Amino acid sequence: MKAAYNYRATKTACSDRQVLILGTSWADPQPGTMEEIRISIVNDKATRNKRNIEEETDLSPPPKKLRSAVFLCSTPSSAPHCSQNVEVFDEFDDSLLEASSDESDSPLHMTLVQIEELLEDDCDYAAEPPRWDEESDSVGFLQELAVPNGSQSDLVELRNLNSPLAGEQSDSSQTLTEETVCSQDTSNYAAMAPSPCWSNISTAGQNEEAGGNVSTTTSPVLHKHEMDRGSRDSDICSTLSSSHLPGDLKVVDEISETSDIPFDGDIDELLTLSPGDTTSSEEDKITSESTPILSKLESVPVVHSHSEAFCKSSSSLQLPETSLASSTEPSPSLQLSASSVTAMNGQNNSNKVPPPTSDTAPGPQLGTDTNSQKSKGQKVEPKKNKPIEQIGLKQGGKSFAAPVDHPVKENLGQTSKEQVAASIGCKKKVNPSPLQEKKHGAVPTKPRAACRPQISNSELEKNRNIYRDRVMMHLEVHSISEEPNYELAYLLNETSRENPTWQHPSDYTKRNYYVRRQPAPCSLNDWVMRNGGHSIQRFHGLPCTFKRSPMPGVLPTGPT
């Protein structure tokens, strides 16, 4: 049998192979008797034809083939070329899609079809826009909770406002009310994006600046709750006014106050909300009367550290004189913010020469305001809350308002003068100490270069003689010539003068060393004869093992 293989190269995969079988016998090797049988085997990989599963069904299921390392999923992939690359995958293996005997092969105990359905449901849920129509029932329930004691007519008004017709009217008039805030989903406030809606007070301020082209519509029910809540918000720091908070926070605050449903919010939201302190009935009455004043005053743009509201024209800040006169009267439950006070002062002084700038707080301005009020004949009630002082800091042409609270004891008998004096007394004027001038001292002279003194011999001899004469005069005056030490010194000096070779004991330049005499050189035999001769056996006690080195002609080789 001989087999010949012919390969045809293709671009996609292996080509068809053709087997040629030659039938021959060994007895007749002639080529004429050979039978040529050609068998062509079709390769499915080359033609890319799938087999029919029904024709290939056997008793045993086909073994599962190993997949490649590339992971394929039913969800859209960022690399679509992975499933279309023919060089990487030879064929699509459908054996994994066949139903096996045990459906619990996956860790989730779910089939691949069920997993794909779950993935599609998740994708549809993520891409689905929020359904506002389905949430209308929950919004209506929240609005009914916001008005627990309201009448049936109020509820009908709220439902009419939430109707599509009311929504079209509100869109045509371009107004934003509290009902539009309620129409949003408030069940999951922590996950909501910041609402574009503003509060009624902020829209009122915007309408004042726009010139009154936009009409403000407010709900009577929510306005009632806004008036009740004004007394509770009076003790909050004045820098955080109700216009600073988004409208969603107001709605959540009202629902949490008027209903028993627990509020589920973040710690940041709880910190920004009002504490809800209890107040007396008298303060509630005064608050309800002063609520319109609050809406007018807070319509003035507030000065923040990151804004420049004073750069606007004075026409946008003009208010009627009656509102200014009523707003200057302090109430026990109403506390103006420092930013609104600065805006009012800027309006009153718009036609006057601006005062010189100073780093200290504007304390005298408060005194002038109270005196002008007394001249008009208006009675000023004592303040029960903490007075607010404003410290103005001007940096680079921008004004920054920072409120500072000074605690003052409550005293109903105090007049406005005493309060102004107490507030001014709290301010401590810091006078900068004068700079200490440096004392100009004497400039130290530069040290001269050190040089070796040079003395002439004549001058040295002259100084020596003067010194010697003074010493001799000292000895003669004290009469110490009789002492033995003086006599010895005198004797040594005289001896050294007479005999220059004599060594003076005070002269340490010469030393008297003893010199040993060197003996006369002699031979060894002479030295032996001088020290006892040969009769003295010096090495007689040495053992026989000791032998000296042989010195021929000088010493014998060994003892005899």
Swiss-Prot record:
Residues 313-352 have a biased composition (Polar residues). Its main location: nucleus. Keywords: Nucleus. One of its GO terms (cellular component) is nucleus. It comes from the Eukaryota. Pfam families: S100PBPR (PF15427). Disulfide bonds: none annotated. It is found in: Nucleus. Residues 378-387 have a biased composition (Basic and acidic residues). GO terms for molecular function: calcium-dependent protein binding. Residues 259-292, 313-400 are annotated as: Disordered. Transmembrane segments: none annotated. This is S100P-binding protein. It comes from Xenopus laevis (African clawed frog). The gene is s100pbp.
